[in-house]
C-alpha cells in the first residue's frame, strides 16, 4: 500500500487567554476574575500546550482533546466578540491567516487540528496496522464532518467549506483504501476487491471535485488526489476483468481491461503505477490474444458496471458525539444567561403576582365598594395632598404639549412630501420609474392623513379629559375628611376585609421579593449544566398556590357581603331617610373621586396612545427621508 497523505496542522497566533478572559469576567459578569485565577492560568497553559506544537503525537492529540473539551465549556459561559483568534491555513503553498472573534472559529480550528493529528498518526502506521489506520482516518473525517454540520453563515468567510469537504472525502478515500489493502492482504476474491477499489476512486473523485475549486489547497495536492482517483478506477476495472476471466467471460474481461487501460493514463507516475500498468498491459495482451484465437467472445461496447461498496464513514469521536462535557474549570462562574434568565423570570414572577393575586383582589374590593350605599364612605377613603392633585394638572399639560409637538412633526413631514411632489414633473426625464414614485408619494399622503386623524382623536379626548378634570372639586378632595366611624356591622366587615386584602397584597409582594428564583437557577445549572430553566420556574411559582386559593375564597366572601348589603338596602328602600351633612359630604367626595379616577385612566391611556403615535410618525419620517435620498 502506498504512503497515505496527511492533513498538516494549522498554526495559530498566541493569545493571552488568562488576561483576556479575566477582562471579560470583570467587565460582563457579576463576579471578579481574581476568584478564578487558577482556572484562567490553566486555560492559558492548555491552549499553549495544544496549539503551539506542530508534531503529530498521541500526547499532542490528548492535549488538543482536553482543550477542545474546555472550549465547549467556555462557549457556554463566555460571550462572543471579546477575544480575537488568528489561524493560518497550511494546505497551500504559503500560509495565510484568518481572524475572527467568535468562539466557534477557535473551536472549529481546534477540531480541524484533531482531525489533522489523526490523519498524521494514520499516515505513520505500517501495513500491519491497517485496521487502526482506517479507524483514525474515519475519525479524522468525523472531525471535518462535524465542522460542516455545525458551520454557521457568519463563519463562512473565515472557514472555507470547499476545503473542508475536500479533506473530508480525502480521509474517507484513504480509509477505504485501507479496507482495500486489507482485502488484498487477505487474498479476497477479485469481485469484492474491485467493488472496494471503485469506491476508493469515487471518494478521491469527490475530494478532487472540491479540492480543485478550493482557494486554499495547493496544486500539487489537487493533482495527487486526481491521479489517485484514476489509479483506483483502473484497479477496480482490472480486478473486475480478473473476475470475468475466472468466470470464462473473456469478452467482458477484455472490455474491462480496456477501460482500466484508459483510466491508468490519468494516474500519473507514482511508484505503484508503473508496475501495475505493466501487469495490466501484459494481462490485456494475453487475454485479447486468447479471445481472438480461441474463445472468440463478443467484446461489448459498454464496459460492465461495477457496483461500488463503501466500508467507511465519518466517525464522531466521543467528545463531539456527546457534546458539552462537565469540567471543573470555572465551575462557579455563572454564565450571563443565568443572570439574564433570572432577571426575566423575576419580571414574569412579578407579573404573575400582579395578574393572579394583586389585580383580582383589587378588583374584588372595587366590586365590593361599588355595592355600597351612596352615603357610605369607601373603606380607606382619604383626601389628596395639594401636590398629588397638581400632578394631574401637570400631566394633562404635558399631554397637550406632546400633542402639539407631534402636530408640528407631521407638518414637517407634509412639507417634505409636498416638496417631493413638485419635483417629480421636473425630474420625469431622469427617472424611468416616475409612475412608481408618484404611487409612493400618494401612499405617504394617505399615511399622513391617517396619522393626522389619529392625532385629532387624541386631542379631542385630551380636551374632554381636561374638561372633566376642571369639574372636580379640588377643595373637597384636598381637605382632610373628618368622618366618624360607621356603626353599621356590615360596613365594618367591608372595611375589615378591604384592609385585610391590601395587607395581604403587601405580604405577597414582600414574599415575592424575598423568594427570587436565582438561587434555584444557580443550583440547577451547577448540577446539570443546562440552561433550560422553564421547568424550574414553573415549579418555583407553586409557592403562590395558597395565595391563588385565597383569591378564590375571596370571591365567596364578596358574594356573602354583597348579599348582606343588598338585604339591608332592601329593608331601607321603603323608608324615607333625610340625608345628613355627612351623607352629602360623602356623596360629593365619592363623585369627585370617581371623576378623578376617570381622569387618571384617560391620562394613562393617552400616554400610551401618544407614544404609539410618535413611533408611527417616526417610521413615516424615516420612510420619506429614505425616499428623498434615493430619488
UniProtKB/Swiss-Prot annotation:
PROSITE patterns: BRO1 (PS51180)
GO biological process: invasive growth in response to glucose limitation; protein processing; sporulation resulting in formation of a cellular spore
InterPro entries: ALIX_V_dom, BRO1_dom, BRO1_sf
GO cellular component labels: endosome; peroxisome
Gene3D superfamilies the UniProt entry points to: alix/aip1 like domains
Residues annotated as domain BRO1: 3-368
Stated family: Belongs to the palA/RIM20 family.
Function: Required for the proteolytic cleavage of the transcription factor RIM101 in response to alkaline ambient pH. May act as a scaffold protein that recruits the calpain-like protease RIM13 via VPS32 to its substrate RIM101.
Assembly with partners or alone: Interacts with RIM101 by binding to its two YPX[LI] motifs.
Protein name: pH-response regulator protein palA/RIM20
Organism: Eremothecium gossypii (strain ATCC 10895 / CBS 109.51 / FGSC 9923 / NRRL Y-1056) (Yeast)
Amino acid at each position: 500500500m502506498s504512503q497515505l497523505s496527511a492533513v498538516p496542522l494549522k498554526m495559530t497566533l498566541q493569545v493571552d487567554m488568562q488576561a483576556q478572559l479575566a477582562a471579560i469576567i470583570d467587565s460582563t459578569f457579576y463576579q471578579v476574575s481574581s476568584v478564578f485565577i487558577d482556572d484562567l492560568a490553566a486555560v492559558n497553559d492548555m491552549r499553549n500546550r495544544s496549539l503551539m506544537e506542530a508534531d503529530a503525537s498521541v500526547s499532542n492529540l490528548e492535549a488538543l482533546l482536553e482543550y477542545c473539551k474546555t472550549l465547549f465549556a467556555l462557549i457556554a459561559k463566555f460571550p462572543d466578540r471579546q477575544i480575537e483568534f488568528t489561524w493560518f491555513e497550511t494546505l497551500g503553498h504559503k500560509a495565510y491567516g484568518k481572524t475572527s472573534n467568535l468562539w466557534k472559529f477557535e473551536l472549529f480550528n481546534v477540531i480541524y487540528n484533531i482531525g489533522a493529528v489523526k490523519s498524521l498518526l494514520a499516515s505513520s502506521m505500517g501495513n500491519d496496522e491497517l485496521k487502526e489506520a482506517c479507524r483514525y482516518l474515519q475519525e479524522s473525517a468525523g472531525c471535518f464532518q462535524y465542522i460542516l454540520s455545525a458551520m454557521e453563515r457568519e463563519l463562512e468567510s473565515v472557514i472555507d467549506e470547499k476545503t473542508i469537504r475536500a479533506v473530508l472525502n480525502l480521509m474517507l478515500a484513504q480509509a477505504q483504501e485501507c479496507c482495500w489493502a486489507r482485502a488484498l492482504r487477505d487474498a479476497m476474491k477479485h469481485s469484492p476487491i474491485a467493488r472496494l477499489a471503485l469506491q476508493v476512486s469515487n471518494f478521491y473523485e469527490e475530494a478532487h471535485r472540491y479540492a480543485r475549486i478550493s482557494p486554499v489547497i495547493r496544486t500539487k495536492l489537487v493533482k495527487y488526489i486526481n491521479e489517485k482517483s484514476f489509479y483506483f478506477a483502473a484497479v477496480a476495472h482490472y480486478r473486475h476483468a480478473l473476475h470475468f476471466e475466472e468466470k470464462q467471460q473473456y469478452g467482458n474481461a477484455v472490455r474491462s481491461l480496456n477501460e482500466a487501460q484508459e483510466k491508468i493514463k490519468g494516474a500519473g507516475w507514482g511508484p505503484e503505477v508503473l508496475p501495475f500498468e505493466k501487469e495490466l498491459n501484459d494481462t490485456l495482451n494475453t487475454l485479447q490474444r486468447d479471445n481472438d484465437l480461441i474463445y472468440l467472445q463478443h467484446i461489448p461496447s459498454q464496459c460492465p458496471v461495477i457496483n461500488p461498496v463503501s466500508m467507511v464513514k465519518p466517525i464522531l469521536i466521543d467528545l463531539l458525539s456527546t457534546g458539552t462535557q462537565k469540567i471543573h474549570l470555572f465551575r462557579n462562574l455563572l454564565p450571563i444567561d443565568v443572570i439574564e434568565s433570572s432577571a426575566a423570570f423575576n419580571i414574569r414572577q412579578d407579573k404573575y403576582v400582579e395578574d393572579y393575586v394583586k389585580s383580582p383582589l383589587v378588583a374584588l374590593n372595587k366590586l365590593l365598594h361599588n355595592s355600597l350605599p351612596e352615603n357610605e364612605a369607601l373603606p380607606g377613603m382619604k383626601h389628596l395632598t395639594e401636590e398629588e392633585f397638581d400632578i394631574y394638572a401637570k400631566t394633562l399639560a404635558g399631554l397637550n404639549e406632546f400633542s402639539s409637538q407631534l402636530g408640528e412633526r407631521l407638518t414637517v413631514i407634509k412639507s417634505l412630501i409636498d416638496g417631493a411632489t413638485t419635483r417629480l414633473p421636473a425630474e420625469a426625464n431622469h427617472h424611468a420609474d416616475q409612475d412608481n414614485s408618484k404611487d409612493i408619494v400618494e401612499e405617504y399622503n394617505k399615511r399622513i392623513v391617517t396619522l393626522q386623524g389619529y392625532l385629532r382623536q387624541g386631542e379631542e379626548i385630551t380636551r374632554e379629559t381636561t374638561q372633566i378634570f376642571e369639574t372636580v372639586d379640588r377643595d373637597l378632595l384636598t381637605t382632610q375628611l373628618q368622618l366618624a366611624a360607621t356603626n353599621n356591622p356590615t360596613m365594618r366587615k367591608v372595611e375589615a376585609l378591604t384592609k385585610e386584602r391590601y395587607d395581604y397584597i403587601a405580604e405577597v409582594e414582600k414574599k415575592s421579593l424575598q423568594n427570587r428564583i436565582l438561587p434555584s437557577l444557580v443550583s440547577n445549572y451547577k448540577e446539570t449544566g443546562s440552561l433550560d430553566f422553564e421547568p424550574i420556574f414553573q415549579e418555583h411559582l407553586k409557592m403562590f398556590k395558597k395565595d391563588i386559593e385565597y383569591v378564590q375564597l375571596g370571591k365567596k366572601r364578596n358574594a356573602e357581603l354583597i348579599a348582606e348589603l343588598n338585604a339591608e338596602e332592601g329593608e331601607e328602600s321603603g323608608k324615607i331617610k333625610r340625608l345628613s351633612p355627612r351623607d352629602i359630604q360623602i356623596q360629593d367626595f365619592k363623585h369627585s373621586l370617581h371623576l378623578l379616577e376617570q381622569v387618571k385612566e384617560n391620562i394613562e391611556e393617552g400616554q400610551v396612545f401618544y407614544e404609539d403615535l410618535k413611533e408611527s410618525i417616526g417610521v413615516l419620517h424615516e420612510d420619506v427621508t429614505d425616499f428623498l435620498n434615493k430619488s
